[in-house]
């Protein structure tokens, strides 16, 4: 046989599969009507387990795993179709729709905004990039930024989420599991670190360098060149600069921005000490409730899955099936649980596309819990 003959045979089989798939889904519709009439749940785990056992016995030995994967997908598609016919309650599409309708057309130019750190912090610089006239409320920790939003002390909060050099800010991802909030915007900020000290200080004088842990990671190659210098972590780069200014010590330096040098009267001993010159940090802007502004093309979700084989695959298969681009996937352990994780998803899709609400509705039906974190656009 020629390749064209094999392809013709595949085409014939695919046509038969498609016809059988449509017939199967029509039968599933009849099952949905029966279950509705008799108040039966859509999911019947016993029936699915029995079916899979029969499939394993009937399938060729070298195709058993593939057959199980295929039928698990068919079962999942069937359940989703039945739920759509039954009009099963799905809250996430409604939350999205309501937020789109009720949010003003323009993102505010001024607001009370919570930022972690002190004057000169990178969070403040990200805030200034988003708002023309912000009233900044400084918080000592990331946790207090979340709290300021929940308690109504500020309209918005700015938090770092990931850095192009040092990776994810895990402390923020962990706090996402504990607080109620909605992401309304994100912004990418170029981060250039400098080594700051009191005026008149020389690099050879430095015996201790202080900064935030993420900044220290971003400048690890530079720090390797100073093996006799003690490295100390603190809560914020701007706080490190202020510490140097208030210490009066000529042997102490901070890794922070040049903006901090101007604010705290310091001098730069060396500019751009980060590993990568194209060093960016992505910040999110959070609010107490969903606000979806025109142009929103990114959606974030926090998902809890059953601790069983294929649970993550089912989510990824649906994202792929709707043609939605997955731009971020982060897993974080659930506090108090040894073997269960929550997954953070960033999806690239317009809020006006019909696929996004359909996906949200399906995810609600197959996941243990789905938290909608917001739909927004990113400022670069």
Feature roles, as predicted:
Residues 1-380:
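Domain-level signature for soluble enzymes in the chorismate/prephenate branch of the shikimate pathway
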């Amino acid at each position: 046989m020629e390749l064209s003959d094999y392809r013709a045979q595949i085409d014939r089989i695919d046509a038969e599969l498609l016809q059988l798939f449509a017939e199967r889904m029509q039968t599933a519709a009849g099952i949905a009507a029966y279950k509705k009439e008799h108040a039966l749940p859509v999911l019947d785990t016993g029936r699915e387990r029995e079916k899979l056992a029969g499939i394993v016995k009937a399938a060729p030995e070298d195709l058993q795993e593939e057959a199980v994967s295929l039928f698990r997908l068919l079962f999942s598609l069937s359940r989703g179709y039945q739920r759509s016919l039954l009009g099963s309650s799905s809250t996430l599409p409604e939350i999205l729709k309501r937020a789109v309708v009720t949010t003003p057309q323009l993102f505010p130019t001024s607001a009370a905004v919570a930022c972690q750190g002190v004057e000169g912090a990178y969070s403040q610089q990200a805030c200034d990039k988003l708002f023309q006239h912000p009233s900044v409320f400084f918080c000592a920790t990331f946790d207090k930024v979340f709290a300021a939003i929940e308690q109504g002390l500020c309209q918005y909060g700015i938090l770092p989420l990931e850095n192009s050099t040092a990776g994810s800010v895990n402390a923020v991802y962990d706090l996402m599991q504990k607080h109620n909030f909605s992401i309304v915007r994100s912004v990418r900020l170029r981060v250039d670190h400098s080594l700051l000290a009191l005026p008149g200080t020389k690099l050879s004088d430095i015996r201790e360098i202080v900064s935030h842990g993420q900044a220290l990671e971003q400048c690890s190659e530079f720090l390797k060149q100073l093996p006799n210098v003690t490295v100390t972590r603190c809560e914020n780069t701007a706080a490190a600069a202020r510490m140097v200014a208030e210490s009066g010590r000529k042997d102490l330096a901070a890794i922070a921005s040049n903006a901090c040098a101007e604010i705290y009267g310091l001098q730069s001993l060396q500019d751009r000490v980060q590993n990568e010159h194209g060093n960016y940090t992505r910040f999110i802007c959070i609010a107490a409730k969903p606000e979806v502004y025109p142009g929103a093309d990114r959606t974030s979700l926090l998902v809890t899955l059953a601790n069983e084989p294929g649970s993550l695959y089912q989510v990824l298969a649906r994202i792929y099936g709707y043609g939605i681009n997955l731009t971020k996937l982060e897993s974080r352990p659930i506090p108090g649980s040894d073997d269960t994780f929550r997954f953070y998803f960033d999806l690239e899709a317009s809020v006006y596309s019909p696929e996004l609400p359909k996906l949200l509705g399906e995810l609600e039906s197959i996941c243990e819990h789905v938290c909608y974190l917001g739909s927004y656009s990113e400022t670069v």
